[in-house]
Amino acid sequence: MYKAKDTEYKLGSPIHEKIPSFEIGSDRRLDIDDNEGEEVSARDEHDDDEDYEYKRIIEEEFENDREFKDEHGFEIGVVDNDENNDQDCEADTSKSIGSLPRMPGTYDFSGLKSDDNQYNELTETLNQDDGNQSNDIAVGKLGDEASHTYKSTLDPGKPLQNPPPSNLNIDSILKSQLENNKSEGSIGQRIDSISRKTTNSSGGPNIMKDNTLDRIPTHDYENIDDNNVFNRAGDPKIRGGLNASNDASINDNIADISQSTIQTSTDAGESINKGNGDITKGLSNVDVNDTSVNKSKQRNISSGSVIRNPPSASQANQSNQSYHQTRAITPVMNQMNKFQGSNSEASSPREHLGMGINNSAPSTGANSNTSSPMNGSYPNSIAKSRRSGNRVKGVFSNMFSKNKTSTSVTSSPETHAINMKISTPFNAKHVAHVGVDDNGSYTGLPIEWERLLSASGISKKEQQQHPQAVMDIVAFYQDTNDDNPDENAFKKFHYDNDSSHSSIYNATPPSTPGIPSTYNATPLQSEKQLQRQQSQKSQSSHPVQVQSTPKTPNNNYENQFIPSRPAPKPPSSSIPSTKTIKPPPVPPSPSTNTNISPASKKNSFMGRSFSSKSIKALRNSNRKISEPPKAPQSKISDSNTEMGIPKSKSHSNSLSTQSEVEPTKGSTTAPVSSTAKFNSTTINNINGHNIIEEEKNNNTLLSNPKQREQKPDSTIEKRDTPPSPSQSRVSEEESTKKETSEKYNNKENDIPKKSSQQPVRDAKQAALLAQKKREDKKRKNQQIISKLQQICSEGDPNELYKDLMKIGQGASGGVYIAHDVNHRSQTVAIKQMNLEQQPKKELIINEILVMKGSKHENIVNFIDSYLLRGDLWVVMEYMEGGSLTEIVTHSVMTEGQIGAVCRETLKGLRFLHSKGVIHRDIKSDNILLNIDGNIKMTDFGFCAQINEINLKRTTMVGTPYWMAPEVVSRKEYGPKVDVWSLGIMIIEMIEGEPPYLNETPLRALYLIATNGTPKLKEPEALSYDIRKFLSWCLQVDFNKRGNADQLLNDKFILEADDVESLSPLVKIAAMKKATELDE
């Protein structure tokens, strides 16, 4: 009987059930004295028959056990610790000692009394010895007994219905064993070790003090080495240093039992056997150097009973919970134990008696690394492994995704999904600033500007002499050459427009001084110029240059700088709404045009008409032949097709250009002043200029959308008679208020212009802005269509005009000649335009209204207009002689002939100026002649309206080579800009080309701004009268410049020839043109 600290322990299930099977004629017993710690000694030896039966049972047990070892682990469950534990804990005899891993349970030594039958039986059975035979057990086969199981608190299985009674004398067995194994350590110490490794069931009382065993973690691993068990029989080496004479079955039994238990932590609390020195001391004498011990295997800690899962078909299909597993304790994994393979090095079952001391050494077996999942946790480990794999996969997936990334593979799934949206720059500052230092040198000049200035021939000395002029012309060049990639850098600096991008060709750009307008010069120009460039690219159907240029090798360059220059706007309308877009300057060049620099090819402004040479060059460059349509219904949308050459090429081109709305041109016609005296019949009872101004205001007042929306078409007044004086005063007051509001708007617009250069950061804001601009553009187009329907006549032009023959092609339509059905002898010119392809529909309305209200002998007569299925048909007088450019190119004009052209032109300008209209694009391309030499002006698309209030304009439009210095310098200007252009046209008629045509466009603008009056190549060849007249027209100070009335009274004009003198020149030009066609 053994007792320690008033706590009784007894051998728990199933060992007391196995002991009767070992009592086969054994006379030897072990006796243990609880208080004295007597050693157990061997008494009898088993006879051979009994020993054989014993080993047979053990072998069968181990053979059956092998069926489970590879698939299952073992857990320790807590055994209920009641007084009748020996009766409650029943075990199947098949799960005998031979199946060491299948002998779990808690050994309750409180029940082992020296006078107890079970104690005696245990000691007798355990000390049975076979004498000469070793205690090693050979594996046998155990038939059907493998189906029996223990109670749920022990190894899972079904308990025996009628367990055999136990009458072992455990006390005598243990005493005998302790005496025989004194050198090896007492059995009591081993049992004490075993008792300290076991814990109570979750549902039963705790056998340890202070509930210490409840804190012991569990491990779900069990190691089984069948080779070790099998090779133990007959192999004395396995016994290590044990004394053969003292070998008893208890040694192996206890060793096997220890192998089936999971090593408990030494911190399990105070030892139950604290007062039994011999028992405790004996445990330390376990031979840890036993060669058979597999040192790589060390038991782990568990506070549960060893529970075995039932057999399953596949290891992968094992459930997460053990069969009949106790619910009290959740296993805690301390280390990963693996099953030993069949070829692994043999190990002793006593290897785990070291009470947590790691005596392990790496195994050298071939399959020693073969692993097996732990019982009850294998599916969890698989799940963890799979989760880990999925986690790693997710990490790499997120790493290359746009919005997610992972900072650690081991981080949780929530941590790797990080939003990778890259924020836009914040607190950004635009520090680029161009200035001039004390030495006159530029500071902060962008590289693009330096390269541009250097390539354009403007030396640093010239830049230092006129820094402001350089800045002005660079800004102007930016406006007129917006789609040049080299000049995109300009948009990054202070010259930026707030005009909307509802259309790249929106017509009314801001005209604030010092702020250049771009092709997108509309009041809605709040988008970035980069977006404008993209829009321009999208508008490929509207080539920027379709106008004819002088016939020179550098026709591409000339095509970009085709002369077409409307007059600037007055200051009052200089708000962003009234700013017009610059026309591309390409002067008609005579034979000397071949000297155009290549750099000018890539830098050009849009022209509005083609010269005969430019037509030929365009035809050669495009290599496209446009067949004249047989039916007028065909829409001319191919802007790249070759321009058909009519009888009067320049005239037909001018006709085509009148309808063509260049991206660089903006409608700048201001409302007709209250004193303007247009006939009501010509305006069709509609103040067309008010329509244009209303459209401009709608475009410019972006900041006041309500005001823009509140301007209905009903505001158009019918003016059958001039307004009364009271009405005039009212209109003046309204104009004053309007001017004030426009100036206020300009001040407001100046502020956002600085920040408009910054890109839109918020994508949603950009989308809303784009949507708003699309809506504005749509609304604007609807308004224009509505106004055109009011202006145009009803009917089908195909029924009114017959024999249509195409003579030219423009950017958005073709030019035809036809005969009036009612007057077969009358030949008319018809411009057919597709409104959808028109970049700036406002120019069309402007031109129609100006021509309707301008009935003059020196202005091309407007006949009628029709709007048919989206096509606008403009019918006007046909000038078969072509443009003045063709005469200048092919002929040398006398001073009398030059005077005749100037006189007729001044008559037309006087008429327009009297109506408050500035043409702003006077050049040889826009002067048409008939076969009799009569001269008429055309192309009123860039006309601007001025009145008493707004006498000046600041918008830079027109062709640069014919442009006045005040326009280049962005100063206020008035009708006298047309007089300057007339003086440049005189030089063109004298020398065959305008000044600076051979210079790059940027340098030409610089020279116009800095040189003032251009100098003639051979001034001594001219008379004093023409030089005086020319000097009067080309005064840099527009206040000293003569007006149309004054110039008409000049001696040079009074002594000029009649227009009939021009008829031969027209015929010569026609002949040379025909010759060119034949060639």
Swiss-Prot record:
<feature type="compositionally biased region" description="Polar residues">
    <location>
        <begin position="167"/>
        <end position="186"/>
    </location>
</feature>
<feature type="compositionally biased region" description="Polar residues">
    <location>
        <begin position="357"/>
        <end position="383"/>
    </location>
</feature>
<dbReference type="GO" id="GO:0005524">
    <property type="term" value="F:ATP binding"/>
</dbReference>
<feature type="region of interest" description="Disordered">
    <location>
        <begin position="501"/>
        <end position="766"/>
    </location>
</feature>
<feature type="region of interest" description="Disordered">
    <location>
        <begin position="148"/>
        <end position="220"/>
    </location>
</feature>
<dbReference type="GO" id="GO:0035376">
    <property type="term" value="P:sterol import"/>
</dbReference>
<feature type="binding site">
    <location>
        <position position="831"/>
    </location>
    <ligand>
        <name>ATP</name>
    </ligand>
</feature>
<dbReference type="GO" id="GO:0001403">
    <property type="term" value="P:invasive growth in response to glucose limitation"/>
</dbReference>
<dbReference type="GO" id="GO:0070301">
    <property type="term" value="P:cellular response to hydrogen peroxide"/>
</dbReference>
<comment type="similarity">
    <text>Belongs to the protein kinase superfamily. STE Ser/Thr protein kinase family. STE20 subfamily.</text>
</comment>
<dbReference type="GO" id="GO:2000910">
    <property type="term" value="P:negative regulation of sterol import"/>
</dbReference>
<keyword id="KW-0067">ATP-binding</keyword>
<dbReference type="GO" id="GO:0007232">
    <property type="term" value="P:osmosensory signaling pathway via Sho1 osmosensor"/>
</dbReference>
<dbReference type="GO" id="GO:0005737">
    <property type="term" value="C:cytoplasm"/>
</dbReference>
<dbReference type="GO" id="GO:0007096">
    <property type="term" value="P:regulation of exit from mitosis"/>
</dbReference>
<feature type="compositionally biased region" description="Basic and acidic residues">
    <location>
        <begin position="730"/>
        <end position="753"/>
    </location>
</feature>
<feature type="domain" description="Protein kinase">
    <location>
        <begin position="801"/>
        <end position="1053"/>
    </location>
</feature>
<dbReference type="GO" id="GO:0010629">
    <property type="term" value="P:negative regulation of gene expression"/>
</dbReference>
<dbReference type="GO" id="GO:0000011">
    <property type="term" value="P:vacuole inheritance"/>
</dbReference>
<feature type="compositionally biased region" description="Polar residues">
    <location>
        <begin position="282"/>
        <end position="306"/>
    </location>
</feature>
<dbReference type="InterPro" id="IPR051931">
    <property type="entry name" value="PAK3-like"/>
</dbReference>
<protein>
    <recommendedName>
        <fullName>Serine/threonine-protein kinase STE20</fullName>
        <ecNumber>2.7.11.1</ecNumber>
    </recommendedName>
</protein>
<dbReference type="GO" id="GO:0001402">
    <property type="term" value="P:signal transduction involved in filamentous growth"/>
</dbReference>
<dbReference type="GO" id="GO:0034063">
    <property type="term" value="P:stress granule assembly"/>
</dbReference>
<dbReference type="Pfam" id="PF00786">
    <property type="entry name" value="PBD"/>
</dbReference>
<feature type="region of interest" description="Disordered">
    <location>
        <begin position="261"/>
        <end position="323"/>
    </location>
</feature>
<keyword id="KW-0547">Nucleotide-binding</keyword>
<dbReference type="GO" id="GO:0005634">
    <property type="term" value="C:nucleus"/>
</dbReference>
<dbReference type="GO" id="GO:0106310">
    <property type="term" value="F:protein serine kinase activity"/>
</dbReference>
<feature type="compositionally biased region" description="Polar residues">
    <location>
        <begin position="651"/>
        <end position="678"/>
    </location>
</feature>
<dbReference type="InterPro" id="IPR033923">
    <property type="entry name" value="PAK_BD"/>
</dbReference>
<feature type="region of interest" description="Disordered">
    <location>
        <begin position="339"/>
        <end position="389"/>
    </location>
</feature>
<feature type="compositionally biased region" description="Low complexity">
    <location>
        <begin position="309"/>
        <end position="322"/>
    </location>
</feature>
<dbReference type="GO" id="GO:0044025">
    <property type="term" value="F:histone H2BS14 kinase activity"/>
</dbReference>
<dbReference type="InterPro" id="IPR017441">
    <property type="entry name" value="Protein_kinase_ATP_BS"/>
</dbReference>
<keyword id="KW-0418">Kinase</keyword>
<dbReference type="GO" id="GO:0008349">
    <property type="term" value="F:MAP kinase kinase kinase kinase activity"/>
</dbReference>
<feature type="domain" description="CRIB">
    <location>
        <begin position="422"/>
        <end position="435"/>
    </location>
</feature>
<feature type="compositionally biased region" description="Basic and acidic residues">
    <location>
        <begin position="21"/>
        <end position="32"/>
    </location>
</feature>
<dbReference type="InterPro" id="IPR000095">
    <property type="entry name" value="CRIB_dom"/>
</dbReference>
<feature type="binding site">
    <location>
        <begin position="807"/>
        <end position="815"/>
    </location>
    <ligand>
        <name>ATP</name>
    </ligand>
</feature>
<feature type="compositionally biased region" description="Low complexity">
    <location>
        <begin position="679"/>
        <end position="690"/>
    </location>
</feature>
